[in-house]
Structures are given as C-alpha cells and as structure tokens.
Curated annotation (Swiss-Prot):
Highest taxon above the source species: Archaea
InterPro entries: MJ0106-like (IPR004425), Proteasome_assmbl_chaperone_2 (IPR019151), PSMG2_sf (IPR038389)
NCBIfam families assigned: proteasome assembly chaperone family protein (TIGR00161)
Protein name: Uncharacterized protein MJ0106
Keywords: Cell membrane, Membrane, Transmembrane, Transmembrane helix
Amino acid sequence: MVDSMKFVEKAKIEFENPIVIEAFPGTGLVGSIAGFQIIKDLNLKYFGYFEVDGILPLTTIEKGIPYPPVRAYANKDFIILFSDIIISPFKINGLAEFIVKTFSNKNPKLFVSLGGIMAGKSEKVFGIANKEELIEDLKNYVEIFDFGVVGGMGGNLLIKCHDNGFDAIGLLAETVGIRPDPRGGANLLEVLNKMFNLNVNIENLIKEAEAIENKLKELAEQHLKMMSKSRKEYPMYI
C-alpha cells in the first residue's frame, strides 16, 4: 500500500530537528482548525503534497492557485500535515506508515497528532504517547487519556512511530460533536503554545467560538418558542 503513495517536495527547507504535526480532519475538525492557525500565524511555506491512490479528486484554490488536498507546510522547526478531505479508513494505516517513512530523513524531534473526542463540551485536552517518558512529560500540560478508543490517524501514527523508533504524542481536545468547533481548536493551540512556545494567536478562534455558541443559543431559544406556540395552537398534534 505504501508503494502506491508518493510525497512531492515543492520547496527546499533546511530542517533543524523539526516537530511534525499531523492536523488532518477529524471530530469537530479541531486538529484542522489548530493546524490552519499555525500555518497562518507562523507564515509557513508550502512544502509539498501527498499522492495517494483512491482519495477524492479535489483541488483547493487559494488566491487563484490550485493545491492538492493532502499537503504539508513547513519552516525549519515545524512541519504541518494538512488535508482538505477526510482520509478513508482504508488508507489510514498505510498513510501513517508512509508519513513516518517520508519524514524520517528530516531527523524529526517529535511527531504530534491533533484530534478530538466527542464530549458534548469543549473544555479539556487529553494526551497520549508512545513512550512512558513522554507520558510523564505530558502530565505537565494535559490530563492523560487513560482508557478508550482513538479513531482516525492519531493512534495509527503513534504506533508506526514507535515501530520505527520515533517519539510521538497525541493531543485530543474535547469537542461538542461533528460540527466545526473553534473552541476545541483553540484549546489545542493553548497547549501547543505552552509546549513549543508557538505564540499562535487564539483570540480570533475564541471570538468565533463565542459567535457560534451565541447563534446556537439563539436558534435553540427560537425553537423552544416555536414548540411552545405549537403546543398552544395545535395541542392534539404535539
């Protein structure tokens, strides 16, 4: 499966033991939201893209220029893996292995996977890691995810990293559900800022989250009023 994948480099960057951050779409899109903010705030360069057989033939247009859907942005310290499409479950295992294989020659300091867990709220960020020593370090920043199941790229990437001798952690933000959750993304960024001194601005994400929450509250109130009115006018149908 890995043989049918390819990474095409589009820029030459002199890396200095970079941190590789996987920010593919998942629950609440929290990883994608955080990844996009890092790319924007750190002004990362378009580094290259993945060719993966069988993924959606979608092309992203930014300022009139087309980009492949699964791509990477970087500077000397960070490589952000970003995708505009949800990766098929049948491709995840092979792609995780290919990611480790592709970036192993960049002498990465650490692999980080960003994801979400459905909790009906957006408060905590949990951590997982592929080594006991990393777990101890994570405890300084987040609560450890003791038991459960992790879907998507995250768990697979940590296992493939361990198989190949690379350190890897996963950060899992609580999220309200399947809709985009900027507050969950902001919570991830808050942890990443502390861990890696990113200094990424999260105020805009918080404002966006508050706007979404206020709109949902307004819609809920309208729905309750409508239901109350319906009960009075048409009691036999409620």
